[in-house]
């Protein structure tokens, strides 16, 4: 007769089940970490999109300013325009001088500058913001690439 202990195979099975449980738990943790990383990347993408949208809004405003400035310096002297005074209200005003522009220099400080100088300053701000936008778009592209690399791993690990 065999002197084998009948409880031995049960212990082996129990140990094997315990090991599978540890691996499953480790797999669950890995999936959770991958999902957390994915959520973080998606949040960063959303933040960058918001930043790009804000930069685009400022660029659009600057282009509009440039367009109005160009028109007024060429055609505006003596014209009557509607000046916004807030809350959808306007007042008529006659343009007398198109040679200078009052421009904000920050901190509630404004400065009177020649129109051509104001135009150059606006163009310079547009160029700088377009560089910022390009940098943000590159970062967005990189994050999208990371998400596209991570998604298959999340699906693969999550399916196990």
Swiss-Prot record:
- Molecular function terms in GO for this entry? unfolded protein binding
The organism sits in which domain of life? Archaea
Any one GO BP annotation for this protein: protein folding
- Name the keywords, alphabetized: Chaperone, Cytoplasm
Q: Does the keyword Chaperone apply?
A: yes
> What broad class describes the main subcellular location of this protein?
cytoplasm
Recorded GO CC terms: cytoplasm; prefoldin complex
Location relative to the cell: Cytoplasm
Establish whether keyword Cytoplasm is in the entry.
yes
Coiled-coil regions listed in the entry = none
Q: Which HAMAP family match?
A: PfdA (MF_00308)
User: What does the function comment of this entry state?
Assistant: Molecular chaperone capable of stabilizing a range of proteins. Seems to fulfill an ATP-independent, HSP70-like function in archaeal de novo protein folding.
Family under the similarity heading: Belongs to the prefoldin alpha subunit family.
**What is annotated about its quaternary structure and interactions?**
Heterohexamer of two alpha and four beta subunits.
Its name, as the record gives it, is Prefoldin subunit alpha
